[in-house]
């Protein structure tokens, strides 16, 4: 029986310390090699989503540096579209090379530019939370605020300050129905890059909005809409922990929705890092009754052999 898995890649799978295109392409080639075992036995249909927080923030800065009457800077929704195409191209290249290297040329690869519908009244528009772009020290942050006083910055996990923008919850993926025949044809599909281009519904179609959607919540929505059997959220650690970095820390393996909701109520997961991944996984499990796993790229082999990682069950 063929199993359909939606894989959500963390930012560490694309951008390391070097923001050049070449470095990000090399990082994705490594990522593609690590993901291929999922599909090598022809028993898994894989759909891949990814974030774009660093890339879209960097692109906006480039846009603003060149902003002029004759060459105006693009708005945030358009920048999301640009990075979705950019990273989608890199991912298609990386998967194609990895497939050829592993004698799996039979698997076609496609990257689809997708729009994600959000609610125009989502309270997230009034409370920016999504970090984008580079890190700044305090002096750098103050300098940016002098140039752009309406920007909002937050301290990010002890690594410095980052700009944050609205991150409304996704309600649906416009192109979801068009994706199903591609996936069923054993095409390796990359979709909903950077959470998808944020749009709201209008009488004559859709209108782009200034936001960046969390890629894990978007992945949960994609997984639901394409009827995936599993949602696999990849991050920097093999398991989710409670009492993290404390003497009594404990890794979570198989946990229920009710247990995870209890840990959230205790404040076990950091708002800017593990919490949205856990919440996205819970969203998928509660809507579908199917499992979601949070683990690392490096743990994929063990996930395949032993179902390891933190697996959330109904």
Predicted features along the sequence, with ranges:
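C-terminal catalytic "cap/lid" subdomain
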Residues: 2-314
């Amino acid at each position: 029986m063929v199993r359909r898995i939606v894989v959500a890649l963390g930012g560490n799978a694309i951008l390391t310390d070097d923001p050049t295109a070449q470095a990000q392409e090399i990082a994705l080639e490594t990522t593609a090699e690590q993901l291929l075992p999922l599909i090598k036995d022809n028993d898994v249909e894989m759909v891949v989503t990814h974030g774009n927080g660093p890339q879209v923030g960097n692109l906006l800065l480039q846009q603003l540096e060149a902003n002029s009457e004759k060459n105006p800077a693009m708005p945030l929704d358009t920048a999301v579209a640009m990075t979705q195409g950019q990273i989608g191209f890199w991912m298609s290249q990386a998967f194609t090379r990895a497939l050829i290297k592993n004698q799996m040329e039979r698997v076609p690869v496609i990257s689809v530019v997708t729009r994600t519908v959000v609610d125009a009244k989502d309270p997230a528009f009034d409370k920016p939370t999504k970090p984008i772009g580079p890190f700044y020290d305090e002096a750098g942050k103050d300098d940016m605020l002098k140039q752009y006083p309406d920007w909002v910055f937050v301290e990010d996990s002890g690594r410095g300050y980052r700009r944050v923008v609205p991150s409304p919850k996704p309600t649906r993926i416009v192109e979801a129905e068009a994706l199903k025949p591609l996936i069923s044809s054993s095409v390796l599909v990359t979709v909903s890059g950077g959470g998808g281009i944020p749009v709201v519904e209008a009488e004559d179609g859709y209108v782009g909005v200034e936001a960046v959607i969390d890629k894990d919540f978007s992945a949960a929505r994609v997984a639901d809409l394409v009827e995936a059997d599993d949602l696999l959220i990849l991050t920097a650690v093999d398991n989710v922990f409670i009492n993290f970095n404390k003497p009594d820390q404990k890794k979570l393996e198989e946990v229920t929705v009710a247990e995870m909701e209890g840990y959230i109520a205790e404040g076990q997961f950091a708002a800017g890092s593990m919490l949205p991944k856990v919440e996205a996984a819970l969203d998928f499990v509660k809507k579908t009754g199917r499992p979601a796993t949070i683990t690392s790229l490096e743990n994929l082999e063990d996930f395949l052999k032993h179902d390891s990682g933190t697996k959330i069950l109904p």
